[in-house]
Regions:
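A short acidic/basic microdomain associated with nuclease active sites
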Residues: 45-62
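Nucleic-acid nuclease catalytic cores
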Residues: 85-132, 137
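Intrinsic disorder/low-complexity segments
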Residues: 1-8, 132-152
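Conserved catalytic cores of phosphodiester-cleaving nucleases, focusing on short active-site segments
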Residues: 28, 51, 72-90, 101
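Interdomain/boundary linker segments immediately adjacent to catalytic/signaling cores
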Residues: 1-26
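Hot-dog-fold acyl-thioester-processing enzymes
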Residues: 29-36
Length: 152
């Protein structure tokens, strides 16, 4: 990945984290995930980013497409998957879920954000997509046959 792409990823993840911190500052912990999601959408729109909410992800199983096998909470600028949680602590399954979404979307980075903490900075995990994307399971490749990993 080019340095410019890494910088763009840092800018995008920075905007998402800033939005999350603002939402958490205003609302605090204790609400349902749906409330934080709605407020994150409002906040991210003010940060001038493209967002897809509850994006359906298809899965190919034995040559059969399951159109809405999964739903991400947010995909930001086509390159960052954001999963919101309201849990006492992250579990391994939360990271596994995000890694699956990264694999299926081809996005290079994801953020787990747990709003059930006193300070959101303690409830954020950045997860990198280090897995290869099986053919037919994610976004189509770019013009050179490589998986799409850049922003935008």
């Amino acid at each position: 990945m080019a340095l410019a792409d890494l910088r763009e990823l840092n800018v995008v993840t920075g905007k998402v984290i800033a939005a999350g911190i603002e939402v958490h500052r205003v609302l605090g912990p204790g609400l349902l995930e749906a409330a934080y999601l709605a407020c994150m959408v409002t906040e991210l729109r003010e940060h001038d980013v493209d967002i897809e909410v509850q994006k359906a992800l298809p899965l190919i199983y034995k040559n059969v497409t399951v159109p809405c096998a999964f739903r991400t909470d947010l995909v930001v600028n086509g390159c960052v998957v954001v999963e919101l949680k309201c849990v006492s602590e992250f579990l391994a399954i939360h990271q596994a879920q995000l890694l699956t979404y990264l694999k299926l979307t081809g996005c290079p980075v994801g953020l787990l954000m747990n709003f059930q903490v006193p300070a959101l900075k303690h409830g954020i995990r950045r997860v990198l997509n280090t897995r290869t994307v099986p053919a037919g399971r994610a976004a189509p490749p770019d013009d050179h046959g490589r998986p799409k990993v850049g922003c935008g």
